[in-house]
């Protein structure tokens, strides 16, 4: 009988894309794979095309700010735990892997109630709320950065691994990327990414600076679902996508500089691909500040050029692009010195090891 694994994680693509890299590895080795996510999250549309059984459960948002919706969240979380527990009783997987996000906590607790071992993964410098709450119920947690260890009491549960990256992303073809965009090879390409949901401030800034940017560069713009600007279709040197899946590796390969939010997964991919970059972290007014922390760390190493979201304007962005181009060789060398690589093999080994470990009855 083939071993089985359940994956969970969702809310944004950053909690799903790393799972996809692992799913491909486990399917290649003959494991049965299923996924538990939120009922209406982005994870469903990302996972279902892979022909994997998807189960939606109730989940609370785990907000850190006051909202009347917070009054309902505990009930949603309890319902999610019950639904997950019943699913696990039926599926009986050997192990569960959690990538975090608000759906993960009820799934992790449901697995613990069924004595199913859980391996979690945290991408950021400091753990998100879902992983903080899940920590007592997991067997192991894999961290991207060593700096994250200080936030957890049980050091024996921690493995610093890095982040899993799809092997496909590392083998992009620059000529194919240029061909998709109908670009020429003699002009430098910039790749702009605002995350799976898009980034309004980045989109607006790129479009306001487009005339100046395209006079010197070619711009590949991943602007988010529903965020395309029809008035810019056909502008020479500019190619916009809602998001990129199969072609993302080629678009990365075609680009010399990346402009991006500072989510840990995207940042890790950018570093693994050795791309000089500009980071525009989400403001702490609308987030827990994890992207700011990620960006500051690599800015301190002289690797990342960082623009505060509140200060993002066309002239500031144009100056940052010029700064990166001027220091490109220096930045290239500093990124190479980090020796960032995909952690897929390490994490797969930990998951397999924990599949045979008894889950403790007391947290």
Swiss-Prot record:
Keyword vocabulary terms for this entry: Cell cycle, Cell division, Cell inner membrane, Cell membrane, Cell shape, Cell wall biogenesis/degradation, Glycosyltransferase, Membrane, Peptidoglycan synthesis, Transferase
Domain of life according to the entry: Bacteria
A Gene Ontology biological process term: lipid glycosylation
UniProt pathway annotation: Cell wall biogenesis; peptidoglycan biosynthesis
Annotated binding of UDP-N-acetyl-alpha-D-glucosamine, by residue: 12-14, 196, 291
Its membrane topology: Peripheral membrane protein
GO cellular component: plasma membrane
Main location as per UniProt: membrane
Record field: catalytic activity: di-trans,octa-cis-undecaprenyl diphospho-N-acetyl-alpha-D-muramoyl-L-alanyl-D-glutamyl-meso-2,6-diaminopimeloyl-D-alanyl-D-alanine + UDP-N-acetyl-alpha-D-glucosamine = di-trans,octa-cis-undecaprenyl diphospho-[N-acetyl-alpha-D-glucosaminyl-(1->4)]-N-acetyl-alpha-D-muramoyl-L-alanyl-D-glutamyl-meso-2,6-diaminopimeloyl-D-alanyl-D-alanine + UDP + H(+)
GO terms, molecular function: UDP-N-acetyl-D-glucosamine:N-acetylmuramoyl-L-alanyl-D-glutamyl-meso-2,6-diaminopimelyl-D-alanyl-D-alanine-diphosphoundecaprenol 4-beta-N-acetylglucosaminlytransferase activity; undecaprenyldiphospho-muramoylpentapeptide beta-N-acetylglucosaminyltransferase activity
EC number: 2.4.1.227
Pfam family, one: Glyco_transf_28
Subcellular location: Cell inner membrane
Protein family: Belongs to the glycosyltransferase 28 family. MurG subfamily.
Biological function: Cell wall formation. Catalyzes the transfer of a GlcNAc subunit on undecaprenyl-pyrophosphoryl-MurNAc-pentapeptide (lipid intermediate I) to form undecaprenyl-pyrophosphoryl-MurNAc-(pentapeptide)GlcNAc (lipid intermediate II).
Protein name according to UniProt: UDP-N-acetylglucosamine--N-acetylmuramyl-(pentapeptide) pyrophosphoryl-undecaprenol N-acetylglucosamine transferase
Source organism of this protein record: Legionella pneumophila (strain Corby)
Gene transcribed to yield this protein: murG
């Amino acid at each position: 009988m083939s071993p089985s694994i359940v994956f969970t994680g969702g809310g944004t693509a950053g909690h799903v894309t790393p799972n996809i890299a692992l799913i491909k590895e486990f399917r290649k080795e003959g494991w049965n794979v299923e996924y538990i996510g939120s009922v209406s999250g982005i994870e469903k549309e990302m996972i279902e095309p892979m022909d994997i059984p998807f189960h939606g459960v109730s989940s609370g948002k785990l907000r850190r700010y006051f909202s009347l919706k917070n009054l309902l969240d505990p009930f949603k979380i309890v319902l999610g735990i019950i639904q997950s527990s019943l699913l696990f009783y039926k599926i009986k997987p050997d192990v569960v892997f959690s990538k975090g996000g608000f759906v993960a906590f009820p799934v992790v607790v449901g697995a613990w109630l069924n004595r199913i071992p859980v391996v979690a993964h945290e991408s950021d410098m400091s753990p998100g709320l879902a992983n903080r709450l899940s920590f007592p119920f997991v067997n192991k947690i894999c961290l991207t950065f060593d700096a994250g260890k200080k936030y957890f009491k049980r050091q024996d549960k921690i493995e610093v691994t890095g982040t899993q990256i799809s092997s496909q992303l590392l083998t992009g073809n620059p000529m194919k990327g240029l061909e998709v965009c109908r670009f020429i090879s003699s002009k430098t390409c910039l790749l702009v990414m605002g995350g799976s949901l898009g980034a309004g401030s980045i989109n607006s800034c790129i479009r306001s600076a487009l005339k100046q940017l395209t006079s010197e560069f070619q711009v590949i713009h991943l602007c988010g679902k529903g965020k395309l600007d029809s008035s810019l279709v056909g502008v020479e040197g500019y190619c916009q996508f809602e998001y990129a899946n199969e072609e993302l590796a080629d678009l990365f390969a075609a680009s010399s500089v990346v402009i991006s939010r500072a989510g840990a997964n995207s940042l890790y991919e950018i570093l693994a691909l050795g791309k000089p970059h500009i980071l525009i972290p989400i403001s702490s007014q609308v987030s827990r500040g994890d992207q700011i922390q990620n960006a500051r760390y690599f800015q301190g190493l002289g690797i990342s050029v960082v623009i505060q979201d509140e200060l993002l304007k066309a002239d500031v962005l144009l100056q940052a692009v010029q700064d990166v181009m001027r220091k490109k060789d220096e930045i290239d060398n500093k990124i190479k010195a980090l020796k960032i690589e995909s952690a897929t093999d390490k994490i797969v080994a930990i998951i397999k090891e924990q599949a045979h470990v008894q889950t403790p009855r007391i947290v």
